[in-house]
Structures are given as C-alpha cells and as structure tokens.
C-alpha cells in the first residue's frame, strides 16, 4: 500500500523520518518509558493468538496523517486495554490518543499528506480495499530511531 501512495508522489510512512518503519498497528505509544520494565510487564501478561484484521476504509487525523481503518474484535480492544494497563503501571507515560476508549486501531499510510494530496491517497488505496492483515508478532519500537526490540509473545 505504501508503494501505491509513493507512486502518486505522496510520502508514505516508509520514507518518513528514519525510513525504518514497517506496517503495523500500535496498541500504545509511550512518550516516556523504561524499556526493561515495559518489556517485563508485557511478558508477564502472556501470549495471545494471532489477530486477523480487515482494513476497509481510509481515515484522517490532524495535520494530514492518513491511515487505513481496521475493523477489530472486542478481544483485540481488550488486549489493547490490558497492554495499556500493564505498561502504564510501570510508570510509562501514554500518548493521549492511545487511552482505552479513545484509541483508533489503524495502520498509517501517509503521515504528512497535504489537503491537495488527500484525494490522491484515497484513490490510490480505495480500489485495493478491503485489505486483510494478520498480526502475529509484536515489538517495542523506538519511533525516533527505528530501533526494534521484538517481544517473545504477542500480547
């Protein structure tokens, strides 16, 4: 999907910042955290089965952040709530948009699309949707550097 967006001259998450992004759905974004404590807390909740998602729409956050909207099960929402609960219990500071009840499960497309580019992004992806995805692994990712620390199990 990122290729389709980039082919239309719109920067996708692939070419954003450090260029090490991979397609993903985030349970949480932490503004401050202690990695060892967060890793241990997530390990303590045990592993879950892979998650099947269906992306069937394009969404828009402020400042031109376009994304694919995922239809999710109540189990997936419960997992996100559990992840937030255990990581914030370590003292980690959660980004306000990832609070349970506010969180919108999504996969980012273009992080800085202009108003003129929004219909271009939508046209690039609408004929491909729905897009099915399987989440079968998880990691802690430092989005500033792109450093990825895989987790042993999918929370």
What would you call each of these model-derived segments?
Residues 1-52, 75-134, 149-155:
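Basic, often amphipathic N-terminal segments
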Residues 53-57:
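A short glycine-rich, hydrophobically flanked beta-strand micro-motif that places a catalytic Asp/Glu
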Residues 58-61, 136-149:
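Glycine-rich beta-strand-turn "strand-cap" elements at beta-sheet edges
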Residues 64-65:
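Charge-rich, low-complexity N-terminal segments
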